[in-house]
Amino acid sequence: MKISDLGYDESFLDLFEGNDFELYDHQRMAIEQFRKGKNIMVSVPTAAGKTLIAYSAIYETFKKKLKSIYIVPLRSLAMEKYEELSRLRELGMRVKLSIGNYDDTPDFIKRYDVVILTSEKADSLMHHDPYMMEEVGLMVIDEIHMIGDEYRGPTLETVITTARYVNPETRIIALSATVSNASEIAEWLNASLIKSSFRPVPLKVGILYRNRLFLDGDARSDVDINLLVKETVDDGGQVLIFVSSRKRAEDMAKNLSQLFDPINDLKVSSEDANVYDDLLNEMLPHGVSFHHAGLSNEQRSFIEKAFRHRKLKVIVATPTLAAGVNLPARLVIVKDVTRYGDLGITYLSNMEVKQMIGRAGRPGYDQYGIGIIYAASANSYQVVKEYISEEPEPVDSYIGKPEKVRFNTLAAIAMGLATSQVEMEEFYRSTFYYAQNGEDEIPNRINESIKFLKENGFIKEKDSLRATEFGKMISNLYIDPESAIILKKYFDDNDDIDTALYYISLCREIAPINMQDDYAAMEFLESIGHIDGDIEAAKTALVLREWISEASTRRIFEMYGVAPGDLQARVNNADWISYSLAHLASIFKPERRRKLEILNMRIKEGIREELMDLVLIPAIGRVRARRLYEAGIHNVQELAFSDPSRIKMLYGFSDTLANAVVKRAKAIVSERIR
């Protein structure tokens, strides 16, 4: 069967540049099952054509005048998928990406045909109105095996459960990597399972041990990683190498860059004096880079784009890249099969290693992919052999953890999906957790959650369970009830900024900062009257204070050891928690609300208060706003009446940008006058 045999308009074929190719067996079977009204679970290797299945289902749903939502586990994947699915506009569909602001209501969905969401965003929208699912005809769940992730999995499972609970008629297409219990997940979804080991680009998997490469039934001596990388790049291929730590990624990339002469003029330049710029710029011209979560979002995007466009030949990355964006390469090397964590040194899971080596082989460029796992010792050699010979671990549910039950219990009561413990238990019977474990401890945990929520003012009970104003707000704001209790205490404390930053930093949504200097944190706690307070939260508050005082990311790294990517992650969460704190003021201390709204904007933008007006202009961030301010342009009105030729003289402003910001400032001033 070819694409043209599907019976679609010719415009559908245009999505594939008019290439009327033969469908793979798993694509044909999935489309046939979907047309029979079935839910579908597709479990196939990476780059095996899952996107065509989604396109087909979305198109058929659109023809029925129904909406589709496409759910992914990570923001980076959502942006990548949005770029891909935006092509559906050529078929007349309205496509929307929504990944920010967890306080949005789902009303906007009515204006679109296809909406791409992270699982957290989808869950937060359902907190506002779960019945949005009544307008959704199709839910595509990408990377459904992520329900087995201890941290992100429960949210994805909650989204799927809520959607099916509210509207059992919503069709589901679940896309998965190869997992050993795919049939168990498919049964939970009431879905037809389409399982295949087919890869369009064949994969060869080998082991590098004691300078011997065992690959494809052959053994080759005197081989090391440098040699394999050099051979692959010289032959026109690209290489991904996975290592266990950021420092190892940086050091290895620097060493590998010395193997190659300069081949491009790539240069990264961060507006905010980023600490990694110099190191990256040493190696980028040689076609080599590192990639880890300490880099800023902009730096990571720059590296990923350069690799896709084949300007970069080698990336040395930490495992976070394997779970993120799709970056295939001819050769993938798993250099480290262990990691250091809370439990000491542990081996990577089979699933993680399979995800890494599964990226080997770039369709359209490579005839085959090569995945090589490095064994550093006799013990790891035995483990590596098991990675190759055994199936990935089964996917298990984590939605039954007490804190997840508590979060979901408040949400279900606030949404009106449950008004009693019996109804809450009924909701949990629709979860994958129940499919795997039966009742287990769930009734007890629901009972404990209800007791906790009543005692702390989130819900009340007369004839039935109902959310209080406080409980409803917390559910809509999408924050943990324990964090809400912490924030509530702030309103009985001082109203200064440092105290607010401390309470924000206490919340579980903000990961603690690994900083050695306890003395500065103790001084901070003493200054706000919390001498016996939480040292780790105080460290985070100190970093946030530097951020809103306009310290550069380089200075924050030098002072506190917080890398730009880690800073961005904490700022993003602190932005959300401070937004929530400002909203809670309307219940507990309305007179503090305006001050907290100002703090929220300062955290969001990383600015002092006097720059708040200027950063309303798109493309003007904290650095450009400060340059304008120091040049005597203090607000939007003054910018609107400025000569662009004066602005373009400032560092960081091109002629085009200067004209654009003045034009936008004029528009804002005009709107304010009306």
From Swiss-Prot:
Pfam families: DEAD, Helicase_C, Helicase_dom4_arc, HHH_5, HTH_61. GO terms for molecular function: 3'-5' DNA helicase activity; ATP binding; ATP hydrolysis activity; DNA binding. A motif (DEAH box) lies at residues 142-145. CDD domains: SF2_C_Ski2 (cd18795). Its EC number is 5.6.2.4. The keyword DNA-binding applies. One of its GO terms (biological process) is DNA repair. Gene3D superfamilies: 1.10.3380.30, 5' to 3' exonuclease, C-terminal subdomain, P-loop containing nucleotide triphosphate hydrolases. Residues 224-411 form the Helicase C-terminal domain. It catalyses: Couples ATP hydrolysis with the unwinding of duplex DNA by translocating in the 3'-5' direction; ATP + H2O = ADP + phosphate + H(+). Keywords: ATP-binding, DNA damage, DNA repair, DNA-binding, Helicase, Hydrolase, Isomerase, Nucleotide-binding. It is an enzyme of class 5 (isomerase). ATP binds at Q27, V44, P45, T46, A47, A48, G49, K50, T51. Belongs to the helicase family. Hel308 subfamily. NCBIfam families: PRK01172.1. DNA-dependent ATPase and 3'-5' DNA helicase that may be involved in repair of stalled replication forks. PANTHER family: ATP-DEPENDENT DNA HELICASE HEL308, DNA POLYMERASE THETA, PUTATIVE (AFU_ORTHOLOGUE AFUA_1G05260)-RELATED. Monomer. This is ATP-dependent DNA helicase Hel308. It comes from Thermoplasma volcanium (strain ATCC 51530 / DSM 4299 / JCM 9571 / NBRC 15438 / GSS1). The lineage of its organism: Archaea, Methanobacteriati, Thermoplasmatota, Thermoplasmata, Thermoplasmatales.
